A protein has these predicted regions:
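N-terminal secretory signal peptides that target proteins for export/translocation
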Residues: 1-10
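Sec-dependent N-terminal signal peptides
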Residues: 11-20
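C-terminal motif of bacterial Sec signal peptides marking the signal peptidase cleavage site
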Residues: 24-27
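Feature for extracytoplasmic/surface-facing segments of secreted or surface-associated proteins
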Residues: 30-215
Length: 215
């Protein structure tokens, strides 16, 4: 009797067994496909990652001279400050450095170990009028009026200039610079705030001193 029943349901049992086997195979294949997809996704994600590398910047020291000039502000990339008694400033190599006094920008240019007014004017030279006017301005602001021992610009002088809110155009002829109301207002304000006599240094005197500095 059992043999008869087995024969009777033999076909059904084989069919069920085949369905189970196929289902297991499909399940394994699905898991493999999913794992493969996850692996490909991870690899793709890793490939797309770009390292965020910031190039290092070389910071060096230089000196600004018309004699050593102390008390002028400088900006070179992330480097900012005020020159010391040796005219020392810091700069980012390959960038630009800008100098100012009391908010008055005197010039900018490619930085180097030693700079003078010649280096902060496009096409600058000892005879360039803008260069000479910058030298006149800096020598006028010298605290003791004797640029041969260095030019020192005090914080009081810088603050006096800042209160005027003036900007100065150095790219003019000697006469126009001497008569410029902005220049004269700054000179007068410095004299008032420091309590000393201040007169705009002549073109001849400023140029002579500058030439001795550059030589």
């Amino acid at each position: 009797m059992y043999l008869i029943l087995i024969k009777k349901y033999q076909y059904n049992l084989l069919l069920i067994l085949m369905v189970v086997v196929v289902s297991l195979m499909l399940g394994c294949d699905s898991d493999y496909t999913q794992d493969d997809s996850n692996l490909n996704s991870a690899l793709s994600s890793d490939t797309d990652i770009t390292p965020n590398i910031t190039p290092s910047v070389s910071v060096k020291s230089g000196s600004f001279k018309d004699s050593a000039v102390a008390g002028i502000n400088y900006v070179s990339g992330g480097e900012t400050g005020t020159t010391d008694s040796d005219g020392t400033f810091k700069y980012e190599e390959g960038g630009t450095v800008t100098f100012s006094v009391g908010g008055v920008v005197i010039g900018s240019g490619p930085p180097s170990a030693e700079m003078t007014p010649v280096d902060i004017v496009d096409g600058g030279s000892e005879d360039n009028q803008a260069v000479v006017n910058i030298a006149r301005f800096l020598q006028t602001l010298d605290d003791d009026g004797d640029p041969t021992n260095g030019i020192g610009i005090s914080s009081t002088t810088s603050e006096a200039i800042k209160t005027t809110g003036k900007s100065i155009d150095f790219n003019v002829d000697a006469t126009s610079f001497s008569e410029n109301t902005d220049v004269l207002d700054v000179v007068q304000k410095v004299a008032t705030q420091t309590g000393r006599e201040v007169e705009l240094v002549s073109e001849t005197k400023a140029k002579s001193h500058l030439q001795n500095t550059v030589m």
